[in-house]
Amino acid sequence: MKIIDMQTAKNVIQVSIDKAREMNINPIMVVVLDHRGAIKACLGEEGISPFRFKIAYGKANGAYQMGMGSRALFNRAEQQAYFVNAINTLADGNLIPVPGGVLIRDENNAIIGSVGISGDSSDNDEIAAVAGIESIGLK
């Protein structure tokens, strides 16, 4: 299994931020979780609200812990609000079911981490996260 090491996490963050600048969106906070679901690296651009860390972490954590991207969690929340609310309670509020949390999968489709981004619209956050993940040759 491939591991998300510190340099890989930093690369994901930089490419995600570069994508955000290319798109000319609001400043973003990026959180990368490793194969254990632990924070490997995080970085917020200048001008980002400190609260954005919690949102980005909640997106990454929810995706990782539930084994589905936060867009899928968003769809599930629309259909099973009580279930997602209960899971969020179990996660001590660290599950944000809106797009912007993306799983990192290796070449065997195993989950090896996740990326969470907050700062702009959820769709734009997700685009930046995907760019970061794709930059390291993963999906």
State each model region's role.
Residues M1-K139:
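Flexible, solvent-exposed loop/hinge segments and secondary-structure transition points
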